[in-house]
Amino acid sequence: NTLLGLAIAIILALVAALVGPLLIDWGTHRSLFEAEASRLIGVEVRVTGPIEARLLPTPSLTLHDIEIGNGGDSKIRARLLGFEFALGPLMRGEWQASEVHLVGPALGLGLDASGQVRAPNLAIKFNPDNLSIDRLNVEDGTVILSDAANGAHATLQGVWFNGEVRSLLGPFKGEGAATIGGELDPFRIAAGRYTEDGALKLRVNVDPVNRPLSIVADGALTLAGAKPKFDGTLSLTRPVEIAARSATQSGETVSQPWRLSGKIKVSTASALMQQFEFRYGSEDQGLKLTGVADFQFGKRPHFDGVLSGRQIDLDRALAAADGTRPPPAAAIRRIAQLAGGAFRPAIPIQIGIGIDQVTLGGNSIANLRGDISTDAGGWNLDRFEFRAPGFTQVKLSGHLAVKGAGVSFTGPAAIEAGDPKLLAAWLEGRAATAQGDVRPLTLRGDVTFGSDKFAVERL
C-alpha cells in the first residue's frame, strides 16, 4: 500500500503537467515528485533512479530505485515501480490502474519488545477507494521478519505475487510464492474490505513444495492497536492426492491422508488452537481424535497439546485395500514408523494422550494414557500405560527412534499378564488355542525392540 500511495502521489503531479509537452525530462523534476509524494503519504520519499513517463496513448509511469522512510529497519526500497492507467476512467477523475509492476521490493517488519509492529508510520492524505488495480505483479521481493523480545527472525526471499485490487482498503485476491529457509511455499490469498474497527476478513492457502501438506487459514485479521491478532480456523491437511504422490516419491506402498483442523486464536506471542480435530485415514474408515493445543512463538518455540478420544478403530484405519489387516505387533510397528516419519516436526512438541478404547486385532486396548515429546532423533514416551488382551496391564517409558524406514524402542517396561498365552496369540494375530494350566506373568526390565532385535536387560 505504501508503494501504491507513492505512485498515486507522483501520477497526480504527472497529470497536472498534461498541458505541457509530451516528451519531458522528468528527472529534472525529481524534487517536485519527492516533495509531493512525501506530503501525501506522510514519510520521506526518494527516487534516486531514472523517471520515465508517457501521457499518450496510455498514461504510464516507471520509477527506478525508490526509498520510503527515514532510515532504519522500517525503510522500504524497490528497484522498479511501473504504473499503467486506463485513460477513460482517468479523464473522469477515477484511478483505475490496468497494471502495476513492482520489482525488487525489500522491507522489514518486526515486533518491538512490547509486541507492537514496527513499520513506517504513514499518514495517507488521499482516499484509498479512489484506486483500483486490474493486474498487480510483484517479483523478486524480500521481507525480513524480526522479534525484538527474543531475537527471532526469518527472511522471505524471491517473493512474487499476481493479483487484483479493487481498493487499497480491499477487497483483493491473488496468488504467489515465497522461499523460506530454502523451501518454496506457494500461496493463494483472498481478503475482504478493511473495516473501520481494524478487521480484515482473510483466507490464505499455502501448499509447500517440499512437504506433503496443505495449509488453510480462514478468519479475521485485526490490525488496530499495532498488535495484530487473528481469530478463525486453521486446517493442516495431507489429502488423498498429496498422500498418493508422497507415497510414490518415498517408495511407500500405502500412504493415508490425514487432517488437523480447528478454531485458532493467534497473537504476536502465541497461537491457541481450540476444539481441534485430528483425522487419520479416509472419512468412513479413519480414526478421529479431539483436543486443544498451545503454540508459543519466539526464539525457542514449542507446542503443547492434549489429544483424547472415546473409541478408535485401528483395524479399519490400517486395513489394506482388500480388507486384510496386519497383526497387532506389525500394526504397532507401523504406527510407530508413521509417528516418526510423517509427523516429524521441526519444533519441540509435547502431547498428552488419553483414549478410552482402541480396537486392534479384533480385540480391545483400554485406558490408553501417556505423554509424548520430540527430540532430534524421534519421540520420547513418558508414563505410557494401557490394558491389553489377556488381562494385561502394560506400563512403559523410553525413546522411540526413527531412522529411514526403521523404528526402534528403548526404555523400561512393566507387563503384568493374567493370561500370557492369550496376549501372545493376540500380538501374533492368531486364534487362541485351548488353554491348559494358565499362570500369570509379571515382567519388568529395560526393553530394546527394533526391526531386527528384541532384548530385555536387567530382567
Where are these regions (language model features)?
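Elongated, acidic membrane-bridging lipid-handling scaffolds
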Residues: 80, 97, 105, 121-228, ...
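Intrinsic disorder/low-complexity detector
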Residues: 310-346, 351
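Flexible beta-edge/linker motif
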Residues: 52-115, 124-146, 172, 294-317, ...
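Short, low-complexity cationic-aromatic patches
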Residues: 261-271, 299-300, 344, 360-365, ...
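N-terminal type II signal-anchor transmembrane helix
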Residues: 1-42
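Short, structured motif recognition centered on aromatic/hydrophobic residues
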Residues: 201, 271-275, 307, 352, ...
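Intrinsic, low-complexity N-terminal interaction/targeting segments
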Residues: 246, 328-335, 339-343, 360-368, ...
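Extended intrinsically disordered, low-complexity coil regions enriched in Ser, Thr, Gly, Ala
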Residues: 281-296, 364, 372-374, 380, ...
